[in-house]
Amino acid sequence: MTRVVLAAAYRTPIGVFGGAFKDVPAYDLGATLIEHIIKETGLNPSEIDEVIIGNVLQAGQGQNPARIAAMKGGLPETVPAFTVNKVCGSGLKSIQLAYQSIVTGENDIVLAGGMENMSQSPMLVNNSRFGFKMGHQSMVDSMVYDGLTDVFNQYHMGITAENLAEQYGISREEQDTFAVNSQQKAVRAQQNGEFDSEIVPVSIPQRKGEPIVVTKDEGVRENVSVEKLSRLRPAFKKDGTVTAGNASGINDGAAMMLVMSEDKAKELNIEPLAVLDGFGSHGVDPSIMGIAPVGAVEKALKRSKKELSDIDVFELNEAFAAQSLAVDRELKLPPEKVNVKGGAIALGHPIGASGARVLVTLLHQLNDEVETGLTSLCIGGGQAIAAVVSKYK
């Protein structure tokens, strides 16, 4: 079977809700990475067979945001593109689709990843197409409803985390401690420049003066403590344990990489970072969607012909501390190998981009001692996706 490799994996900094990227459309974040990857590799843009980009909150952006990003990123009109929506798994699903297209011989080079600007998601006025006869009307927050609401139970994703906390007996203190650890790891990594190799700075033009250049993730917080987090009120249930402090944020960002056949990489003298070994997807009861990575990880390992003990580093999306702790318990993961640079609770969770973001961060950790990695994300609606990669040799 054709070996599929990953090269030139990058991401933007992750912006906080209403932060530096509030006026930068998702497709511009994606275009920035596409332009950088082409420049970095020296690849002829016309060599790219297809562009596949995850993006969840598409309303108001225009037709096919992936195509917009591709064109604005400097790719010729002849390169096709399409947009993927598998909620939080969109970015990784895009990479899986690229992988599948290469294995089947349809493509040789695909630009794949994810992008999201949650700050720009519009408010909707449903049932207004043909006017209102009388009475009050309300708006629907497309970010909350299309991105963060379990449609089957009509409640926020945070309730699914509360369900897991109850089912697994995960305390508020355990969740807050997990969140503090995530922040501390991210602070340390950021201060040590450990994200520098994966981040492409984003220049934002201003009406007056020089552009603002964003170089670091905005959500990383110093001086966070369990004591401080314990003062926060529950966000989703009056007597709940999930808070804004032990959940991932609402964020903006993008991540992208080249997915190639090994033969094409050799032909073009592009040095791969890793080999894609296999993927796994899984579904569970939507009310406990956060536990779905357990099944996805097991399937990805089986298809990769690896055991959990073979994995040197894990990048698992931290949707919620309760959700992450439940998955860690089920899989019995070694904590020293999981999210060693911090996770989404600290870095942020731009939903359509996160699947690619966790893989980008993982790829930049591979070396002679860290040779095999696994990444996974839970997905609203009761799903999950996982991937296993190995350092290219």
Curated annotation (Swiss-Prot):
Keywords: Acyltransferase, Cytoplasm, Transferase
GO MF assignments: acetyl-CoA C-acetyltransferase activity
Signal peptide: none
Localization: Cytoplasm
Catalytic residues in the record: C88 (acyl-thioester intermediate), H349 (proton acceptor), C378 (proton acceptor)
GO cellular component terms given for this protein: cytoplasm
Reactions it catalyzes: 2 acetyl-CoA = acetoacetyl-CoA + CoA
Major location category of this protein: cytoplasm
Annotated family: Belongs to the thiolase-like superfamily. Thiolase family.
Gene3D superfamilies reported in the protein's UniProt record: 3.40.47.10
Enzyme class at the top of the EC tree: transferase
Source organism of the structure: Staphylococcus aureus (strain COL)
Annotated EC: 2.3.1.9
Protein name: Probable acetyl-CoA acyltransferase
